[in-house]
Amino acid sequence: MSHEIVPVDPIDVPSTSYSRPILGPREDSPERATEFTRSLTFREHVSSEPFDSERLPATLASEIQRFLRIANLVESEEPRIAYLCRFHAFEIAHHMDRNSTGRGVRQFKTSLLQRLELDEEFTVRRRKEKSDVRELKRVYHAYKEYIIRHGAAFNLDNSQREKLINARRIASVLYEVLKTVTSGAGPQAIADRESIRAKSEFYVPYNILPLDKGGVHQAIMHLPEIKAAVAIVRNTRGLPPPEEFQRHQPFLDLFEFLQYAFGFQNGNVANQREHLILLLSNTIIRQPQKQSSAPKSGDEAVDALMKKFFKNYTNWCKFLGRKNNIRLPYVKQEALQYKTLYIGLYLLIWGEASNLRFMPECLCYIFHHMAYELHGVLTGAVSMITGEKVAPAYGGGHESFLADVVTPIYMVVQKEAEKNKNGTADHSMWRNYDDLNEFFWSLECFEIGWPMRPEHDFFCVESSETSKPGRWRGMLRFRKQTKKTDEEIEDDEELGVLSEEQPKPTSRWLGKTNFVETRSFWQIFRSFDRMWSFFVLSLQALIIMACHDVGSPLQVFNANIFEDVMSIFITSAILKLIKGILDIIFKWKARNTMPINEKKKRLVKLGFAAMWTIILPVLYSHSRRKYICYFTNYKTWLGEWCFSPYMVAVTIYLTGSAIELVLFFVPAISKYIETSNHGIFKTLSWWGQPRLYVGRGMQETQVSQFKYTFFWILVLLTKFAFSYAFEIKPLIEPTRLIMKVGVRNYEWHEIFPEVKSNAAAIVAVWAPIMVVYFMDTQIWYSVYCTIFGGLYGVLHHLGEIRTLGMLRGRFHTLPSAFNASLIPHSTKDEKRRKQRGFFPFNLGRGSDGQKNSMAKFVLVWNQVINSFRTEDLISNKELDLMTMPLSSEVLSGIIRWPIFLLANKFSTALSIAKDFVGKDEVLYRRIRKDEYMYYAVKECYESLKYILQILVVGDLEKKIISGIINEIEESIRQSSLLEEFKMAELPALHDKCIELVQLLVEGSAEQLQVEKSEELHGKLVKALQDIFELVTNDMMVHGDRILDLLQSREGSGEDTGIFMRVIEPQLFESYGEWRCIHFPLPDSASLSEQIQRFLLLLTVKDSAMDIPENLDARRRLSFFATSLFMDMPDAPKVRNMMSFSVLTPHYQEDINYSTNELHSTKSSVSIIFYMQKIFPDEWKNFLERMGCDNLDALKKEGKEEELRNWASFRGQTLSRTVRGMMYCREALKLQAFLDMADDEDILEGYKDVERSNRPLAAQLDALADMKFTYVVSCQMFGAQKSSGDPHAQDILDLMIKYPSLRVAYVEEREEIVLDVPKKVYYSILVKAVNGFDQEIYRVKLPGPPNIGEGKPENQNHAIVFTRGEALQTIDMNQDHYLEEAFKMRNLLQEFLRNRGRRPPTILGLREHIFTGSVSSLAWFMSYQETSFVTIGQRLLANPLRVRFHYGHPDVFDRIFHITRGGISKSSRTINLSEDVFAGYNTTLRRGCITYNEYLQVGKGRDVGLNQISKFEAKVANGNSEQTISRDIYRLGQRFDFFRMLSCYFTTIGFYFSSLISVIGIYIYLYGQLYLVLSGLQKTLILEAKVKNIKSLETALASQSFIQLGLLTGLPMVMEIGLEKGFLIAFQDFILMQLQLAAFFFTFSLGTKTHYFGRTILHGGAKYRPTGRKVVVFHANFSENYRLYSRSHFIKGFELMILLVVYELFKHTSQSNMAYSFITFSVWFMSFTWLCAPFLFNPSGFTWEIIVGDWRDWNRWIKEQGGIGIQQDKSWQSWWNDEQAHLRGSGVGARCLEIILSLRFFVYQYGLVYHLDITQSNTNIIVYALSWVVILATFFTVKAVDLGRQLFSTRKHLVFRFFKVFVFVSILTIIITLANICHLSVKDLLVSCLAFLPTGWGLILIAQAVRPKIEGTSLWEFTQVLARAYDYGMGVVLFAPMAILAWLPIISAFQTRFLFNEAFNRRLQIQPILAGKKKNR
């Protein structure tokens, strides 16, 4: 053919008109009778609009979208081809859904048919051939020729590569259409998408590796390691013949064989094929390279992968005592093939397992059987049972593995998850992922069989009508496991249905496995019983010692004291008995799956515990003070050794503990015993712990063990010394005094007057101390965490470069540090130790073996600075000041430092030289002392020389310039510069040089304008003449030598005649054609850059000392520089580095801010306005980069998209995260370039080489693709595409912008099966091609994946599309930086470091919180989070060895985790904090988690109080669920004692300590309330003289430590001190207190304790979306009330009432100072809990806003609720939702709730006896009469409410009279009582304090018993009363706000402390707040 196809613009051949019938099946087609037929009405004009190919019905999109896209692509040049493609799409759609039952199918068919009718006649006329078949062949062959002609080219640029890809896509689609038309098979044959694509010649969509024939010429396929890996996978020699599997062609590779053998999906096979090839290639390249060892490296790579993939499987087999089924032949080549097949089989199982991936041992079970079948198939083994060849039980059929293996187990998981009832059901009622997986830890799992027996108990799912006797229990029945044809499988609508017949009697629900998650605070004791027993026994010992007044530890060995102390073992026995009872109670519901030996052991242990509980007390009581003594000859404190029978018993009792102690000191032996499967060791370990698959062998090395043991010994010694001296010992004497006092006259009716020793008073005094005793270890941990974390940071060079000044001072060491850390070393350099930290590097030099090392640093530095400019952190001027010139001089070691280092240095040198008097050597040393000054002087001199050499071209002028230069250099050599030159004239010369260079710069800009150029030429000549005269006349002492040269020229001219002398030009002046200076200068970028740099060197002043001005740029540069001095692994070459992926889950969060969102002002100020004020410098830089002056100019220039990006990159958006993570790819390409490029390429520049050197650029892309993959799991992308959501387009735009980005999503669509729509789910991976999303892989799922917490399943479905050996988890509100991405290959080398016994499996990274720069709350939150992710995790990793996974930027050993359950857990509710469970799981499975501080990732946090509180609530909920989880229980039981302490205090212990610190306040206050109201306090003061108890003051002080946030405050200050300096840290800490940080932390304490405690008791944990809004906005009063009413306001009022009552009735003999100290923190807490939401609410004291809030509050409180009314609209709806946690509560939790509510009745009981009206009567009748008053009050309230219902609408006047009557009656009663019974005003106040808590207590009790009273009038009255209470509390809270709002100064003060950080940065907060008020 003579015409060439251009793919973007399809072929244009002169058209010839032919007539043609409508395309359809041929006449002889069997489908003709049933095919679609319709007459088309022809029209004359074709539509110019492309048909919408994106919004298609979900049921059809995957099958027809490619045809419609290609039609749109070729329509302009080949309209008939477009028509045929659309008609073909229509036929497929009609065949798939003939009755149009799918959603949207009918509409789609109608619109497409209309388009076909419109296009038919016009396209026939435009047809160029006689028939449609010929037309198709013509275009198809044209594209085919283009592909053949250009497909082999290797050096295509991007545009040519895109054209070739488009050509392949078009040819592939045309091939399908042509094949259908010519074969006449009808659309039925083409409906199977996969089979047609398999036949396509040209284009198969691929992810990274184009494994089809068309991809062999791509650069990545030419890498030797890829070729080797492909060869391994394609080695099909020796496989069974394909005919055995109904295949007529040889197998393409091993994966195709596995697919046909076991029935895997095509998409899964294609995905895992590429997966394994990439894994193999990356492993091969890292093998030691030897000559002729390519096959050997392949063997070693496969062996390495085998070891990683099957480590868990082989351990599982060993644990169960089964031989593994990985059987290898002896022939080496065959063994390699077998190994590859086993790895491929596991990957295919894993890739299709869907939610079963959370169950790793379930996958082991499946693989175990399939590996056996695979071996049988490969060897041709014959079954002993059937006598036939071994065949896969589930093989052969289409998708048979999914249907027959995965789906039955998935259905069990799904049905069990449904029983969770959205988190309200008790955990014991359903099996979660762990329960189902742990069933495979026992040999009983093999009873399931293979093929699996559907009647097995494992598949039995309890009915939803739970567990009533005789109830039918449902069981999932699955179809019989037989091979079926594809059609039969498609006809099966249900893979599992509930059997309608009664199951067999033996079928039963197995219940929980190994553990039951029970909601109880006892779970904390059970999980950490050793710790609690230790603290209880220590407390008992300390009390005994205090009673004996022990002052020295040696006194304990006094016989009597020692014997008393030994009584602690009686307590120990009791505690073990309690533990044994709890174990049986808590595991009762797991008894069905518990081995019989385990049941026996539990009973035996309980029996032994009961026996010791009896024996020890009996022996102790009988042998007390009865000793048998022995005397020794040693004169020591052991000179007399006495013992008793009790001591002998204790010795026997402690035998087991002694063995544990010995094993503790030899961790290797204990680890071997735990992990060994030998029978003896099984027996030895059987008694201690239940034999579980996980939790064994977690011991650390002796060095690590010593470090954390030493840490905890210090903590415990400090804690016990403090507790003994300040808490316990001071309490002994007051206790004895209290016990001696006899109380006769109580001030109330004492219920137990006969109790001796004032036991209640002793409890009231001791209880707060006990609470603090159990809590204050957390405080001491925080103190030592600060000390050790700070010491560790100093030793690891943290904060070595903190400021710009320090950066400038150390900048000369950065090149050497950079090359030592980030540049791969040659073989010679690998042995050389890198210099670190405090030792200087070679100034500006790399290693001797790499002369270009400095050039590499310069190139990377400039890339980093350019990225700053791209991100608008710096301006164009700052860019010039910070970049370093890259020229050939760098290779010779001449360094040209960035100008911001040299700022003011040259002018300072001039000032020094100008007035200097002395010798040259002294001046030289003075200038040389400042290296940057020396470099500045030297560079200015060399630059001036260089410019003059180019500028001056006249012979005489050149001689003069050379003469001057020679004079200068000669004087320097002879040290006579000060003698030969007058330095005083240097400033004048400086000014003239500036003038000269400015003219040169101006000339280069104006060189196109001739007239302007001539004018500048004249000025330039004059400037040169001025310089010449200044130097020769004023500066040079012997300037006459230079003048002689000039005069000699003039003298030589006399011989030529007077005429010639007259016309001779002046020096530097041009005449005619003769030019003395070359101006304009040559058009050279490097020359222009050098002139510009010279000008900056001459002109830049002190202002450049603050470059860069942007704070974030400063921080990033400082950290990057500091990290170069930290200990990090050597960098490998990119080709040898570990490959990795990044995975980001995304739900419905912002991707990019839309234009409307940017400018919308509905709820507050617009986002763009906010951004302009918060980031003013970055906005200015952005405008400069865009070349615009303001926002309006941007809009006029059409740069709205750039504006959207700029704003989105400053919010918490997905686009920001994607941009940051794609820096990893950019960094890898640059590093690969540095690895491969020669010196000339480096000097040319990375970007220039990438554009010009296509083969090198293709190779860089190939390496980057092989090493890095980024997958974003957009859960809703499919639904968004279908609905036309703009978010879908935003995601597509991201893929187009970053071509290597991949998006995974779940598609839910309806498929028509037997004319019935059925929901089917697919996991899909897409990429962007030609502006559209193109599907790469499609894997069918067994059902909806989101049956758990959501986010883990979102990660789980996408993890199969990730690649590499490592996986980094990144949230969508994170950021990354180019300079940090350079360190990724160093970080990945950590996996190859073996620290201790195990290599790391999770690498922890530090985070920078980037949202703390504006509001004070955001500042507090960022500092709090920063301290946790730095100093906190630093200590957790080393020395404590208990760092887990906390989400965000951690890097996983990918293969380790995909074979052990994934990177998170997903069971509903219990795994609410899904991330941390990955860390628990890793630790329990003997993984190792480290923390690395040399690399950081950005992280966003919430910035408003409400958002922060929701986040805190979510974390507290998650921690409460962790408390009752099996993971925490096993860690607590399996760790050694000191590591267990670390685990507790760094996980749930922090929250439990916070809870008991608050409980301690309640105990103290209620204890004091008891003492005051009962009259005991008065008696104790008067008779026992008990006044101030120091221990109580200590207890309250300890509580205040937690309350005021010092647990996080101390580490925070230390970390700030390390990174910014301790003076700044102290200043920040003081400033935080002035900004009410104590209020914030006290308020946060209330949030944590409320949600932690409530969730443990009642459940109700749920994910709480915070919104992550970028704008800090005002929250209205009703919103604050809903959020904080029950968590803070109620408790705040309760504390305040307690304090008021105590203040009213306390006895004044107490010291006022002591009382103030004790109660201050409580007053502060109550005030904070009531007021903080309003103090931290922007514009919270603005009158206009206050008025609006009051209206909204009244509307909300009065609105009636109902079905569908949200809680933000109605008080009643909110009130009902607020009790949701009680609906799923058990009887025990409800009873405890009632018991806790009884505390509100204490007020009434105590206060009624202190009324004047009672006249000191303490009879119980007084209390009874008080209830009469309460009932009368309730009756009155009910009467008024009833009257409102009856009369308020129609008989309003009657209702008013009724209210007047009630009011008068109450007033009359009060007056009567005042006159007759002496009722006083104080009585009325006290009555309110007494009766209000009682009413609230009744409401709480009614809520607890709601199921019993709901629907009765009592419940209706409860609602009325609760509304009244809420209204009253709202009024009390609102009144002070309204009063303060009248004072303008309050609002100004609030704005100042809320936004102080912004004021410090001079940001414009007032316009933002003003904008908010305006837009309300």
From Swiss-Prot:
UniProt-listed GO biological process terms: (1->3)-beta-D-glucan biosynthetic process; cell wall organization; regulation of cell shape
Main enzyme class: transferase
Keyword Transferase: yes
Main subcellular localisation: membrane
MF term (GO), any: 1,3-beta-D-glucan synthase activity
Residues bearing carbohydrate: N1676
E.C. no: 2.4.1.34
Localisation: Cell membrane
Keywords, ordered alphabetically: Cell membrane, Cell shape, Cell wall biogenesis/degradation, Glycoprotein, Glycosyltransferase, Membrane, Transferase, Transmembrane, Transmembrane helix
Transmembrane helix keyword on record: yes
One Pfam family in the UniProt entry: Glucan_synthase
Domain of life: Eukaryota
Extracellular topological intervals: 552-565, 624-648, 729-759, 1566-1595, 1642-1688, 1737-1790, 1841-1856, 1906-1928
Membrane topology: Multi-pass membrane protein
Record-linked Gene3D superfamilies: Vacuolar protein sorting-associated protein vta1
Cellular component annotations (GO), alphabetically ordered: 1,3-beta-D-glucan synthase complex; plasma membrane
Cytoplasmic side: 1-530, 587-602, 670-707, 781-1544, 1617-1620, 1710-1715, 1812-1819, 1878-1884, 1950-1976
Residue ranges crossing the lipid bilayer per the database entry: 531-551, 566-586, 603-623, 649-669, 708-728, 760-780, 1545-1565, 1596-1616, 1621-1641, 1689-1709, 1716-1736, 1791-1811, 1820-1840, 1857-1877, 1885-1905, 1929-1949
UniProt-listed InterPro entries: FKS1-like_dom1 (IPR026899), Glyco_trans_48_dom (IPR003440), Vta1/CALS_N (IPR039431), Vta1/CALS_N_sf (IPR023175)
Catalytic activity: [(1->3)-beta-D-glucosyl](n) + UDP-alpha-D-glucose = [(1->3)-beta-D-glucosyl](n+1) + UDP + H(+)
PANTHER family with a match to the protein in the record: CALLOSE SYNTHASE 8-RELATED, LYST-INTERACTING PROTEIN LIP5 DOPAMINE RESPONSIVE PROTEIN DRG-1
The family this protein is said to belong to: Belongs to the glycosyltransferase 48 family.
Functional note: Involved in callose synthesis at the forming cell plate during cytokinesis. During plant growth and development, callose is found as a transitory component of the cell plate in dividing cells, is a major component of pollen mother cell walls and pollen tubes, and is found as a structural component of plasmodesmatal canals.
Protein name, per record: Putative callose synthase 8
Lineage: Eukaryota, Viridiplantae, Streptophyta, Embryophyta, Tracheophyta
